[in-house]
């Protein structure tokens, strides 16, 4: 029976550490600031942004929310981002995705100053990640690495398989595992003999967006299984990309959904914002 990795507990520990560090900085008259830009009225995005704000304030940081209507022009959004780039009280900028179709996400991400790109999506940060240089790492992949390490697993020398090749999770988490000296395979919808490929993994990260896609026959006994999915099953119950009940018997460690990867994402955003503030103050 696999041990369940408690993402809530780990996220709380990291957040407490960030909060303590912020409190020390505030004593010196320095307060990290995070600005979130929300375009339109997507309810899921709104809920997510509210959570980010609440957690930012709990950590003792300045939290700014800028709301823009669905029909805002691309030009207006870019000018808002440019103003935030110049704002000395803001150290992290996050534009909540997805954006309306008439706005280029690429252009918006490219406009965010890479020193304030706490989502880790700017091409400079992506490039730095790939050459192994210190950078802002996308929050979910950063959280995944912390979850793996929390099990006591030595990543170096392990076989890691990542199912999913998105720019937000699959590719960056594969690169982080490579930077930790794992031997990494990226698998996807066109991979032949996927269960065989997955079964070689000491560390399996699943980010397919398909409910309960990974079954027990994908799992090497004792593997660390990280489930990035947020899906609904046939009974409309929240589940992941891994069939938890089927896989938990084979796995050594496994993240649940909910309560696994999810809580780590906002926590790593706070860690990135603190890091951004410290870097900006050091440069100045």
From Swiss-Prot:
Gene Ontology CC terms, in alphabetical order: cytosol
Catalytic reactions on record: (6R)-5,10-methylene-5,6,7,8-tetrahydrofolate + NADP(+) = (6R)-5,10-methenyltetrahydrofolate + NADPH; (6R)-5,10-methenyltetrahydrofolate + H2O = (6R)-10-formyltetrahydrofolate + H(+)
Pathway given in the UniProt record: One-carbon metabolism; tetrahydrofolate interconversion
UniProt xrefs under Pfam families: THF_DHG_CYH (PF00763), THF_DHG_CYH_C (PF02882)
Enzyme nomenclature, EC number: 1.5.1.5, 3.5.4.9
SUPFAM superfamilies, A to Z: Aminoacid dehydrogenase-like, N-terminal domain, NAD(P)-binding Rossmann-fold domains
Record InterPro entries: Aminoacid_DH-like_N_sf (IPR046346), NAD(P)-bd_dom_sf (IPR036291), THF_DH/CycHdrlase (IPR000672), THF_DH/CycHdrlase_cat_dom (IPR020630), THF_DH/CycHdrlase_CS (IPR020867), THF_DH/CycHdrlase_NAD-bd_dom (IPR020631)
Signal peptide: none
One of the GO BP terms on file: L-histidine biosynthetic process
Biological role: Catalyzes the oxidation of 5,10-methylenetetrahydrofolate to 5,10-methenyltetrahydrofolate and then the hydrolysis of 5,10-methenyltetrahydrofolate to 10-formyltetrahydrofolate.
Family under the similarity heading: Belongs to the tetrahydrofolate dehydrogenase/cyclohydrolase family.
Subunit structure: Homodimer.
UniProt-recorded name of the protein: Bifunctional protein FolD
Organism: Listeria monocytogenes serotype 4b (strain CLIP80459)
